[in-house]
Every structure is written in C-alpha cells, then in structure tokens.
C-alpha cells in the first residue's frame, strides 16, 4: 500500500516591509522556526508599483546562513564586500553563503515595471556558520528546465529532480542540508509526483492557481498558501485548473536556532559576538 506524505499545516504569509521599505509577503519567518528547519524564511515580492521596491536593500550584513534569490520578473543588482557583482534577471538565481559574514546590497535596476520573485533563507549547521562567505550568480540559461510527458514545466534550482520518468540535476547542490528547490508549473489537469528523500522537511508554496496534495486525505492548497508536509512517504500533486508551486525540501539540522535580524546562530552569545564583530568591522573578512 502506497504511503503518502500528509499535510501537517497550512500557513498564510503576512505583509511585511524590509530593506529601505520594500513591500513584500513574508511567507515564513518568525516564531517557532524549528517547524520549517532547515528553512528559516521565505519572502515573496510581487508588485507592479515601483514605490513598493525602488528603495531596494542598501548595504547590510548577514551571518550564519545562506540566501537564495529567484527572480521571475524584474532586475536586481547585487554587490558585496568581497567584490562580487551580479545582475539578477528573470529566471536567474543568486545563491549567497553568508557563513562567517557578508555585507551586501540588493538594488533594483529599474524604475518601472513588475518586480516578482522570492528570497529563501537556508540555515547552516553550527560547524559551518563561521566558514568563509561565498557567492554564486546563476544566469537564467544555466538554471535547468524540463517539461514532463504530462506537460508540467519544471525549473530545478537545487538538488536532483526525479519523477520516475525524467531526471535532472539542479543548478546547485549543497551537502549541508541537501536542499531540493523546484518551481513547478502544472497545466489544467496536470499531475506530478516528484521523488524526495525520506527524512527531509517538505514545504509547498502555491503562488498561482491551486493544487491538491493527493493521499488518503487529499488537501487542496489555495493561492498564496504554504503547506508543511510529513517527512516520509510519496508526494503526488494535481491541479484541476493549473498552478505554479515552489517545492522546497531539505534535511533538518535539529540544532538550536537563535535569530536577531540578519544574524542566525545557535546561541545568544554567538549573536552578541556577531553584533560586536559587525561594530568592530571584523564580521566580514
């Protein structure tokens, strides 16, 4: 008998403002971050109004985790203290490992038009929180994409995609949390059953349309809702009218999570050290 992953929780994000006043939806991020371990935060930006994004994210620090920015529409410029410069374009990805520390800015390269995309924060294990920082800019043409026999369009940002018929290695593979990150576009009547490792935390965020998680107790996920699933079993998705959904899966770290603004460590003492290091100019070296 097939065992399916159960929907444990449905979650709705809330309006938020970050950077110099950028308006966004904070899908996850806040109290009880252990529920989403190893994922710390997911922000969605989706606006046609330049006033919502034009101020951008001026220079600011990070320590202790990774950020993944995935752009659907619009253009965003990254610059950091290491001398990295990158222009995020539609379909592109930026994977930044803050680790010991990075100081960077993310500023829009446009004053009109749509700005749509996501930023995901992925935790690092304690042993790697003070490793050297890193940055990778992945051009749209270097992000693997495929279409299944059933007409589902798949963007494989991280990890390995396998639905039993098609396989594809993503743009990024990370050993710490073994993240899988897909953007799926299901047509009307579309179905897909991506294979994900048992033991991985699985999150689904539907950002267009709606879909159903199949199983003994099918659950429909509406637009702009996130589902947290059980860590074992098969995943089967279908959409009657069509949908776009982010699939996030990662190996939980099961370590203490202490966050203060842009710093994510394992203890209050480590947060205080990060604040001192930033004040003394040695956070990002």
Curated annotation (Swiss-Prot):
GO molecular function annotation: metal ion binding; quercetin 2,3-dioxygenase activity
Residues annotated to bind a divalent metal cation: 60, 62, 104, 106
Signal peptide range: none
Pfam families: Pirin (PF02678), Pirin_C (PF05726)
Enzymatic class: oxidoreductase
Cofactors demanded by this protein: a divalent metal cation
Tagged with keyword Metal-binding: yes
EC number, UniProt record: 1.13.11.24
Annotated InterPro entries: Pirin, Pirin_C_dom, Pirin_N_dom, RmlC-like_jellyroll, RmlC_Cupin_sf
The UniProt record lists the keyword Transmembrane helix: no
Substrates-to-products reaction catalysed: quercetin + O2 = 2-(3,4-dihydroxybenzoyloxy)-4,6-dihydroxybenzoate + CO
Cofactor notes: Binds 1 divalent metal cation.
Keywords (A to Z) from UniProt: Dioxygenase, Metal-binding, Oxidoreductase
Pathway the protein acts in: Flavonoid metabolism; quercetin degradation
Family annotation (PANTHER family): PIRIN, PIRIN-RELATED
Family named by the database record: Belongs to the pirin family.
Protein purpose: Putative quercetin 2,3-dioxygenase.
Name of the protein in its database record: Putative quercetin 2,3-dioxygenase PA3240
Biological source species: Pseudomonas aeruginosa (strain ATCC 15692 / DSM 22644 / CIP 104116 / JCM 14847 / LMG 12228 / 1C / PRS 101 / PAO1)
Lineage summary: Bacteria, Pseudomonadati, Pseudomonadota, Gammaproteobacteria, Pseudomonadales
């Amino acid at each position: 008998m097939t065992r399916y992953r159960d929907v444990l929780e449905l979650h709705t994000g809330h309006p938020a403002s970050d950077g110099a006043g950028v308006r966004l939806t904070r899908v996850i991020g806040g109290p009880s971050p252990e529920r989403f371990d190893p994922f710390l935060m997911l922000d969605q930006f989706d606006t046609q109004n330049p006033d919502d994004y034009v101020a951008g994210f001026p220079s600011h620090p990070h320590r202790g985790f990774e950020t993944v920015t995935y752009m659907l529409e619009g253009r965003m410029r990254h610059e950091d203290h290491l001398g990295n410069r990158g222009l995020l374009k539609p379909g592109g990805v930026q994977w930044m490992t803050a680790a010991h520390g990075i100081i960077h800015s993310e500023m829009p390269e446009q004053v009109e038009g749509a700005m749509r995309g996501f930023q995901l924060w992925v935790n690092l294990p304690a042993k790697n929180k003070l490793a050297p920082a890193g940055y990778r800019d992945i051009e749209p043409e270097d992000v693997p994409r495929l279409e299944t026999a059933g007409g589902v369009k798949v963007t494989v940002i991280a990890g390995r995609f396998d639905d039993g018929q098609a396989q594809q290695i993503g743009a990024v593979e990370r050993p710490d949390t073994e993240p899988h990150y897909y953007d799926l576009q299901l047509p009307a009547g579309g179905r897909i059953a991506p294979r994900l490792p048992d033991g991985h935390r699985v999150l689904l965020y539907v950002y267009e349309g709606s879909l159903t998680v199949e199983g003994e107790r099918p659950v429909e996920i509406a637009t702009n809702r996130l589902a947290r699933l059980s860590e074992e079993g098969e995943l089967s998705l279908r959409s009657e009218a069509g949908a776009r959904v982010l699939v996030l899966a990662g190996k939980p770290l099961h370590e203490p999570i202490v966050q203060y603004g842009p710093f994510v460590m394992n203890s209050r003492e480590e947060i205080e050290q990060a604040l001192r290091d930033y004040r003394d100019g040695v956070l990002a070296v």
